[in-house]
């Protein structure tokens, strides 16, 4: 799904620096190519760079990317980091959502029996048969006449509150056209008008709205549903009629701060909202700081009845969370929401209020989880999640699909039948997560899945590391998790390389944690001799600043881990004469605990090493990997780490 033609966009910028003009020219060329049934390369301006084969076959993907680049630059972000939703991915989501809906067939005369042609004794039976046929036909006719869906089986109104260049609308038209093949020309035209009038497309960018409207027209033309140059006719809508409809159904507006411009509630809402924090907005604007403050203030406003507009708004807000809550507000009862968001939503602490809303006040039906190495979006290193929610009620079971591979995406059916699944059943789910409704990260292998489930089930009821009065810490004083005292960015000038023969204070960072088998240790040139001069452990390993060592050994954990490593938790004892970077966390143990482990094991060092072995156990690492939100082993994760007695850990490992 990752395009290899990024160089073409850079060459285009040199030929045409105006990004809005790029979009207008592309749309004009695409429409002309559609009109004449020729490749778009034949209609592009001569001075534009030659279109690579990878982009030639999908003009919509180019439009999406051009718009994403324009919006990124206007917001002060780098256009290189812009990305768009792949069309096949969008179609797979729509196909999965619509695969269980009914599509009506063309109306044909009923197969009724003639009463006059039958003997009197059979007429009562024939009359009942004809009545049954009529009732069946009436039931079928109601499929599209209740106003809740088109005859092609698409729920309406169909909404997208962040429509962009209209990728979902365009793919929906394609699905609609395929389902209308058995209709008569007039039936197809009537149903297409119902679909267009049922659109509710919104975006806060006027440029995006213009692109979406044009793209929808082109999509209709490619499916032979519109006359681009005339008034229409049998089976085709006229262009002016379609444009008039789209003026009402594809509008500019802010779904988060403004009112929804349509009265009827959507039956289906599908969207890929922006993955941006408020603090990342308006970076290129001279009044960016004030604009961010105003945006934050408006989002925190209350409704007319005094309720908060967004009940899940917490801290430094990412906009995708607000779009997801807004989507659940907008759709009608039993309406559906499908949304593409980062897969960190499944486990991160800041999304707990949102997950509670999804589970306790709605039916969270499904989640598709793609790990970051699948690269659904070009240039984006985050994992991708597709959420499926039905409004109202509460969740009994949520089916989690994943970890998924890109080759398991099928535009016709959604996901391949071979995709791994796991059912999150409410009772055990609540017990596992203390009601915060996180979803564990599962491996694909069935044996490894069973190990994860066993570890979670056994550890869920154990006391937490930071809980007061646990078996290690009966004093009532909590065990604290702290970040290393040296911020590597702010103190970069005081951190130097450790050259052979150097003396000074050791600076410990994540790269100094070493794993050999089951043993975790600190490998630093201050404590380990024989390291090569160019070894990575010598780089940024010496501290020359004013902050002094703590003067006592500490139990530390690597905070930033490689997602590809088999082990996530890496605990080791660091010496008393070093300082720690902020890529390392450490435990701040109460004095009574330090004295106790020193007494029981002969010294503080030996006691901490004993505790490190316990915290490095395979069972605890399985737990940690299952609930990891990202590559950062943060304070919240460590504080909530189950903390059973060592003999309990050993018994779990032997099961």
Residues of each region from the PLM?
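Class I S-adenosyl-L-methionine
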Residues: 1-194, 200-211, 254, 259, ...
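Polybasic, glycine- and aromatic-enriched phosphate-binding surface used to engage nucleic acids
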Residues: 321, 328-331, 374-376, 385, ...
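Signature of N6-adenine DNA methyltransferases within the class I
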Residues: 1-17, 21, 84-89, 142, ...
């Amino acid at each position: 799904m990752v395009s290899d033609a990024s160089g073409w966009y850079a060459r285009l910028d040199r030929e045409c620096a105006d990004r809005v003009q790029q979009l207008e020219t592309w749309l004009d060329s695409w429409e002309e190519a559609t009109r004449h049934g020729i490749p778009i390369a034949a209609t592009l301006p001569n001075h534009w760079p030659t279109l690579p084969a990878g982009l030639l076959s999908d003009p919509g993907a180019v439009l999406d990317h051009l718009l994403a680049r324009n919006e990124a630059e206007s917001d002060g972000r780098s256009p290189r980091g812009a990305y768009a939703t792949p069309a096949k991915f969008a179609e797979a989501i729509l196909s999965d959502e619509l695969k269980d809906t009914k599509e009506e067939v063309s109306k044909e005369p009923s197969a009724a029996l003639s009463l006059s042609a039958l003997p009197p004794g059979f007429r009562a039976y024939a009359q009942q048969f004809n009545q049954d046929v009529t009732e069946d036909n009436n039931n079928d006719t109601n499929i599209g006449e209740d106003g809740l869906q088109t005859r092609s089986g698409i729920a309406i109104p169909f909404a997208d509150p962040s429509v962009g260049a209209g990728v979902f609308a365009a793919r929906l038209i394609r699905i609609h056209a395929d389902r209308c093949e058995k209709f008569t020309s007039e039936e197809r035209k009537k149903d297409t008008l119902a679909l267009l009038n049922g659109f509710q497309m919104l975006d806060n960018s006027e440029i995006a709205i213009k692109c979406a409207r044009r793209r929808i027209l082109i999509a209709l033309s490619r499916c032979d549903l519109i006359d681009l140059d005339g008034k229409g006719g049998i089976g085709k809508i006229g262009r002016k009629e379609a444009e008039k409809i789209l003026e009402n159904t594809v509008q500019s507006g802010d779904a988060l701060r403004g009112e929804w411009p349509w009265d009827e509630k959507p039956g289906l809402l599908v969207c890929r909202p922006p993955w941006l924090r408020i603090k990342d907005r308006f970076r290129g604007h001279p009044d960016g700081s004030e604009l961010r403050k105003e945006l934050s203030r408006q989002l925190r406003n209350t409704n007319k009845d005094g309720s908060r507009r967004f009940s899940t708004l917490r801290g430094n807000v990412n906009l995708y969370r607000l779009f997801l809550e807004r989507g659940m507000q907008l759709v009608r009862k039993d309406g559906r929401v499908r949304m593409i968001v980062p897969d960190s939503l499944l486990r991160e602490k800041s999304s707990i209020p949102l997950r509670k809303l999804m589970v306790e006040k709605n039916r969270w039906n499904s989640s598709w989880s793609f790990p970051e190495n699948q690269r659904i979006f070009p240039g984006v290193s985050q994992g991708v999640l597709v959420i499926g929610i039905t409004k109202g009620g509460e969740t009994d079971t949520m089916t989690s699909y994943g970890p998924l591979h890109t080759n398991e995406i099928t535009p016709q059916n959604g996901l391949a039948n071979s995709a791994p699944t796991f059912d999150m059943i409410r009772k055990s789910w609540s017990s596992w997560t203390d009601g915060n409704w996180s979803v564990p990260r599962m491996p694909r292998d069935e044996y490894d899945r069973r190990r994860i489930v066993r570890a979670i089930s056994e550890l869920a009821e154990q006391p937490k590391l930071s809980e007061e009065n646990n078996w290690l810490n009966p004093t009532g004083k909590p065990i604290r998790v702290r970040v290393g005292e040296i911020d590597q960015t702010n103190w970069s000038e005081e951190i130097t390389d450790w050259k052979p023969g150097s003396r000074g204070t050791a600076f410990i960072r994540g790269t100094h944690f070493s794993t050999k088998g089951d043993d975790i240790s600190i490998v630093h040139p201050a404590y380990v001799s024989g390291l090569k001069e160019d070894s990575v452990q010598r780089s940024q390993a010496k501290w020359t600043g004013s902050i002094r060592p703590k003067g006592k050994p500490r139990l530390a954990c690597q905070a930033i881990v490689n997602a590809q490593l088999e082990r996530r938790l890496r605990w080791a004892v660091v010496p008393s004469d070093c300082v720690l970077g902020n890529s390392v966390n450490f435990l701040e143990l109460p004095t009574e605990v330090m004295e106790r482990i020193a007494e029981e094991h002969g010294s503080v060092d030996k006691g901490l090493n004993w505790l490190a072995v316990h915290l490095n156990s395979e069972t605890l690492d399985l737990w940690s990997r299952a609930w990891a939100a990202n590559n950062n082993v943060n304070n919240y994760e460590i504080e909530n780490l189950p903390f059973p007695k060592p003999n309990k850990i050993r018994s779990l490992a032997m099961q």
